[in-house]
Amino acid sequence: MKKNFRFFDNRQKYLLIVTTTNEKNKIADALKPIVQKIKPKFPALKIFDAGMGDGSLLMSVMRQCHQKMPHIPLLVSTKEISMEDVRLGLEKLPDRFVEHKNTVFVISNLNYIESTSLKSNNKKKQKKMNWKVVKPVSYTHLTLPTKRIV
């Protein structure tokens, strides 16, 4: 192994570490006292995650925020460059939206310095920015067929 090897430079080695340890749970537990001290400012509690990964840690923090502040809107912005991690993170979101309905969730692949403002410093890139707005879908208005004997 080369000197100064960083395990997160290799996706397979990184995934081996994060999927076989309780590292994310330990970090989430360490964040609980910090979440308990948060005093959100109007209009929402703003959360920025500089590297969403598979979303496990971020979902834990969102859950903690909901437990402490169930009626405060959440504005969550995160950066991720791996489409696989974006997919894994999106899979974990539905129950967060069900539990905390006043949530806005943004994922970008902008540079770190640009991620918090959601605006590229490069005018050419800014013009090509591709926004995808995913609106929630409700099926509660549908009447589903049943096999009831009346």
Q: What are the residue ranges of the model-derived segments?
A:
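Class I SAM-dependent methyltransferase Rossmann-like catalytic core
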Residues: K2-K39
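Leucine-rich tandem repeat or coiled-coil scaffolds
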Residues: K32, D49, I72-L74
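Conserved class I S-adenosyl-L-methionine
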Residues: P43-G53
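Conserved SAM-binding loop of SAM-dependent methyltransferases across substrates and taxa
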Residues: D54-P70
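Class I SAM-dependent methyltransferase SAM/SAH-binding core
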Residues: H66-Q126
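Extended catalytic-interface subdomain
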Residues: K132-V133
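Conserved small/polar residues in nucleotide/adenosyl-binding loops
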Residues: T140-T146
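Long, charge-rich C-terminal accessory regions
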Residues: R148-V150
